[in-house]
Every structure is written in structure tokens, then in C-alpha cells.
């Protein structure tokens, strides 16, 4: 779209940033405003131009203004589906009713006597005309945005727009674009114009790749949970484990409110803010964090949720449930018991060695036999919740026909009936992502941190993402043109795997891929990397867990 002078790129400069760009990855770098808008805008234009070409191939307008369509074209199927969806008359002009647009949908053979072109009805033509105009209008809006982008400006620049832009639109370019992308995602464009994305072929390679991706996400989620527990403990925060159930008479209300869980956690955050004497309109991210995983009971088929609340300050009215009791068996926190409006909740104080409750003077609880609960590590609660993460991941894979676990078809059907927005893990923004600052580290060390293995630190994926984020900040003042020039050639992993299968066979594929993705061990890394991991408190030696934690108690 933009022309750049051939002398613009400085090869030494491009060569210097190539390894940084490759390590950070375009998915991270495109979080920068200017680069993000540039990439998204070009992607949207490409899609809309494809759709426009689709709508203009296989149709002809004659000198009288009548529209004629080739019934064998791909466009014929699109127009037929649109007419059926909108309830338009499916008949063609000047052609017997023995063949209509509905017949194209059902795949009925076109009569041999049919002409090469069939005349569309006025109703269908009007819908077609308005559709094409709509595509052109969407394209023009994208061209307007693209015309305001400066490829030679830095990737972190937020484009505002010139005087011409201000005459056309009310908001600055970047705000206008963010709103457009949010209100009009690409999937909606495809759906509205009946231009479905081609479905990929499901074979052994695609299954291996999808299963590997899901397992990787599961592992990353568990790492975030465990790191959040570590951080909360180091800051002296309170940890509360909660189970949220759904009452029969509240099921409809829960499913009718897509923000039920979001509102619940927001209310808890506001309770913490109030306890700290702050406005409920403040952000609670610095004093409250949460993690929530759904569970679908395989025995009774009931959806419920397990949540971990991390609080700097307990809500007002939070009292030791065992104060003044002869037998200290209670662990539920009274101030949180009536906050879940869709059923029953059981907020339990998580007790472990050197917890915040002990420092606040809460009595140590006992079990049903009157014996003091065994003191465990703060990380043990993370392991306990992690099993629910693993269980949900197993269900997700089973629904997709992946994994080794056997699940009955009835369960798969029931899971598919639950809205995806409900049956997903949710957590606070940047939950468990905080690590020691990397601003002082060399670029070489940052690149090394993206490759360390689990034996260096069990938080290696979090380490990787933080290092990439730091690299992004160091590339922030590079131009869009520089970054695009420095980006590596991308490889279609699925295509690569399929080609590889022909050489080594499907049975050896997983082991071969594993050998290609080896991580750096403690003997491979530099002293600066070792020192950072140790200083951050995330070395393997710092995080040994010997005992297990259970969520029992009342």
C-alpha cells in the first residue's frame, strides 16, 4: 500500500534487529498500536477485496440494467443462501419454476435445457446491489484508515489523523479503529456476506497439532496460577478458596446474564477496595486477583466453579470463624458467604505455613478428629486447583475428539450445550504474569530467557512471555517498515508436519517434533540468566514442594 524509497532500509540496522524481532515474535510486536492497526487494516482489506471479487465473478449486468447469473458459479450458491435466509422469492425471471435458487442449495442438477445465464428477480437484485454497496463502504473506511498510517513512524505510535480525517470521522484514527474492530470482527463480516472460511482438513497431523496446542495452553495456565500463589504469599496477601454452585431456581437467571461471573468477581474486588477505604470505582488490580475454573460433574452432571481469591485486605466484617469456639473446625469466611446470587458458595480460608490469616491472629483450625490441620506450603493450593484445570482440559479435548481419555457421548452433548463463554477458565488481567523487572538485562539474555526449559524454572513459559514483552519495549521506537523488513519468513507448521509425515511416518512425528523443540538446561545458560532466575526467586531449588494440600474443612 505504501511506497518506501529503496535506500530507506539500512541493512546493518535491519540485521541488528532481526534476531530481536524473531525472538519477540510478530504476535507480541503487533500489540504495539501503529503496527497492530497496519497489520489488521491490511488483513481486513484483503478479506473485503476477496469478498468483493467473489460477488462480482459470475454475474453480469446488461444494458437494460438487468442482472444475469451463471447458475454454476460459486456466487450462485451465495446468492441462493442469502435469498433463502431472508425469505426472498427464489424464482428466476423468465424461467420455469422447475428450477429455483432453492434447488441450487439442495444441489439439484441444473436442467440441460437451462441457458448459461439466468435472470435474477428484482427482489434478489436489490439485495445484491445493497450488499455490494455495503462491501464497498466497508472497504472505503479501511482505505481511509490506511491513508492515515505512516509506515515510517514508530510501531508504538498512536495515529491521530489529519484535517481531512477529522472532517470525516469524530474520533482519532486509533480509537476509531479499535472501536471498528471490536464492533465488526472478521467473523461477522464473513457471516454477513455468506463468505465462510474454508474448513481445514482433519487428519492425524492436525489432531497432533491441536492437542499439542491445548496441552501447551493448559501448562501455561497452571504456571500462571502457581506464580500468582507465589507472588501473593511473598506480598502477605490472603488466599481464599471458593466453590460456586448453581441452584435449580437460579439456572435461567445465570444463563440469561452473560456477565454473571464477571459481575461477581468485580463485586468482590469492590469489597476489598471498600475495606481499604478506597473508591469502588478504582481499579482493584493492585489489591485483588482471582482465578476461576469451571467443572462439569461427571457423576451428577452439574456445572459449578472453583475459584481462588487473592486479597491484600479482607472485606469488612471478616472475622475468625473459630474465635470463641471450643472446637476450631470452621474455615468459611462469613463476609463472603452471601455474595454469589446464583446458588451456594463456600469461601474457605486457605491455611498454610506463615499465611496471612495467622499473622492477623486467626486461630489454627483442626480436623474432624480434633487434630490440628497439617501445615503445608502455600504452593499446595495451586496444585489442588491445577487438577481442575487439567480435568477441564481433558473435557475440552474429548469434545474435540482428542486425547486418550474416554468420555461418553452423552457428556459430550451436554458440554456442547453450555455456552463457551461460561465453560472457560477466567482470571484477572495479567494474573500470575508478574516477575522481577528485566529492564537491566542484555538483549542476549532476554533471548536466552525465551528458551529455558522446565529444569531451570517451572515458570519457564511466564519467563518467556515477560522476556518477549521486554524485547517489544526495546523495539518500540523502531519503524513499522523496519520491523516488517526484519520479520522472519513464517512456516506453515501444519504443512511442514504433513510433508514430514511422508518422510518419517506418522508414528515418529511427535518424537521428532519434540526433539526439534529442545529447551536450554541449567548448563546451557549464561551467568546473567542464572542470576536473574535466582534473584526472581523462581529457580527450581527455591520452589520444592514436599507435602500435598487438600481443600477440606467447613
Curated annotation (Swiss-Prot):
Record carries keyword Cell cycle? no
Q: Which domain of life is it from?
A: Viruses
Q: Is Zinc-finger one of the keywords UniProt gives this record? A: yes
Zinc fingers, unnamed, are found at 287-309
Against InterPro entries, the record matches this protein to: Replication_gene_A-like (IPR008766)
The active-site annotation reads: 384 (o-(5'-phospho-dna)-tyrosine intermediate), 388 (o-(5'-phospho-dna)-tyrosine intermediate)
Q: Which GO terms describe its biological process?
A: DNA replication; viral DNA genome replication
Pfam families of this UniProt entry? Answer: Phage_GPA
Q: Which GO terms describe its molecular function?
A: DNA binding; endonuclease activity; zinc ion binding
Write out the entry's keywords from A to Z.
Answer: DNA replication, DNA-binding, Endonuclease, Hydrolase, Metal-binding, Nuclease, Viral DNA replication, Zinc, Zinc-finger
Function, as annotated, reads: The A protein is a specific endonuclease that cleaves the viral strand of supertwisted, closed circular DNA at a unique site in the A gene. The A protein also causes relaxation of supertwisted DNA and forms a complex with viral DNA that has a discontinuity in gene A of the viral strand. The A* protein binds to double-stranded DNA and prevents their hydrolysis by nucleases.
Name-wise, this protein is: A protein
Organism of origin is Escherichia phage G4 (Bacteriophage G4)
Amino acid at each position: 500500500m505504501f511506497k518506501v524509497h529503496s535506500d530507506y532500509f539500512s541493512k546493518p540496522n535491519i540485521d541488528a534487529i532481526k534476531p530481536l524481532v524473531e525472538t519477540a515474535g510478530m504476535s507480541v510486536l503487533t500489540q504495539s498500536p501503529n503496527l497492530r492497526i497496519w497489520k489488521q487494516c491490511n488483513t481486513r482489506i484483503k478479506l473485503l477485496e476477496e469478498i468483493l471479487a467473489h460477488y462480482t465473478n459470475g454475474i453480469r449486468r446488461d444494458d437494460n440494467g438487468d442482472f444475469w447469473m451463471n447458475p454454476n458459479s460459486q456466487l450462485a450458491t451465495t446468492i441462493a443462501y442469502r435469498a433463502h435466509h431472508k425469505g426472498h422469492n427464489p424464482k428466476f425471471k423468465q424461467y420455469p419454476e422447475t428450477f429455483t435458487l432453492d434447488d441450487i442449495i439442495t444441489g439439484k442438477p441444473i436442467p440441460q435445457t437451462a441457458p448459461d445465464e439466468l435472470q435474477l428477480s428484482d427482489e434478489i437484485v436489490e439485495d445484491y446491489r445493497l450488499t455490494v454497496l455495503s462491501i464497498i463502504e466497508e472497504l472505503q473506511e479501511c482505505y481511509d484508515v490506511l491513508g492515515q498510517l505512516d509506515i515510517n513512524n514508530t510501531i508504538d505510535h498512536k495515529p491521530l489523523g489529519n484535517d481531512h480525517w477529522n472532517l470525516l470521522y469524530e474520533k482519532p484514527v486509533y480509537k476509531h479503529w479499535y472501536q471498528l474492530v471490536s464492533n465488526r470482527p472478521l467473523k461477522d463480516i464473513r457471516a454477513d456476506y455468506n463468505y465462510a472460511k474454508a474448513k481445514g482438513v482433519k487428519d492425524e497431523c492436525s489432531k497432533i497439532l491441536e492437542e499439542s496446542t491445548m496441552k501447551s495452553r493448559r501448562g501455561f495456565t497452571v504456571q500462571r496460577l502457581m506464580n500468582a500463589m507465589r507472588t501473593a504469599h511473598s506480598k502477605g496477601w490472603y488466599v481464599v478458596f471458593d466453590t460456586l454452585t448453581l441452584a435449580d431456581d437460579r439456572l435461567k437467571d445465570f444463563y440469561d446474564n452473560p456477565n454473571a461471573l464477571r459481575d461477581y468477581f468485580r463485586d468482590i474486588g469492590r469489597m476489598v477496595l471498600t475495606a481499604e477505604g478506597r473508591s469502588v470505582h478504582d481499579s482493584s488490580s493492585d489489591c485483588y486477583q482471582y482465578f476461576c475454573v469451571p467443572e462439569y460433574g461427571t457423576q451428577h452432571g452439574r456445572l459449578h466453579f472453583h475459584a481462588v481469591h487473592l486479597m491484600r485486605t479482607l472485606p469488612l466484617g471478616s472475622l475468625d470463624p473459630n474465635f470463641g469456639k471450643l472446637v476450631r473446625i470452621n474455615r468459611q469466611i462469613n463476609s463472603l458467604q452471601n455474595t454469589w446470587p446464583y446458588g451456594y458458595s463456600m469461601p474457605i480460608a486457605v491455611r498454610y505455613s506463615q499465611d496471612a490469616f495467622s499473622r492477623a491472629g486467626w486461630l489454627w483450625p483442626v480436623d474432624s478428629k480434633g487434630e490440628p490441620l497439617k501445615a503445608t506450603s502455600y504452593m499446595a493450593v495451586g496444585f489442588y486447583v491445577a487438577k481442575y484445570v487439567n480435568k477441564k482440559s481433558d473435557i475440552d479435548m474429548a469434545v474435540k475428539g482428542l486425547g486418550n481419555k474416554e468420555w461418553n457421548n452423552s457428556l459430550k452433548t451436554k458440554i456442547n450445550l453450555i455456552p463457551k463463554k461460561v465453560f472457560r477458565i477466567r482470571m484477572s488481567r495479567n494474573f500470575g504474569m508478574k516477575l522481577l523487572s528485566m529492564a537491566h538485562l542484555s538483549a542476549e539474555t532476554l533471548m536466552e530467557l525465551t528458551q529455558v526449559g522446565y529444569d531451570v524454572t517451572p515458570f519457564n513459559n511466564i519467563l518467556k512471555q515477560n522476556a518477549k514483552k521486554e524485547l517489544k519495549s526495546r523495539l518500540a521506537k523502531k519503524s513499522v517498515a523496519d520491523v516488517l523488513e526484519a520479520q522472519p519468513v513464517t512456516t506453515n507448521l501444519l504443512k511442514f508436519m504433513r510433508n514430514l509425515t511422508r518422510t518419517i511416518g506418522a508414528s515418529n512425528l511427535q518424537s521428532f517434533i519434540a526433539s526439534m523443540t529442545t529447551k536450554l538446561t541449567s548448563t546451557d545458560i549464561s551467568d546473567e540468566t542464572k542470576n536473574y532466575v535466582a534473584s526472581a526467586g523462581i529457580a527450581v531449588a527455591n520452589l520444592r514442594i514436599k507435602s500435598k494440600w487438600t481443600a477440606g474443612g467447613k
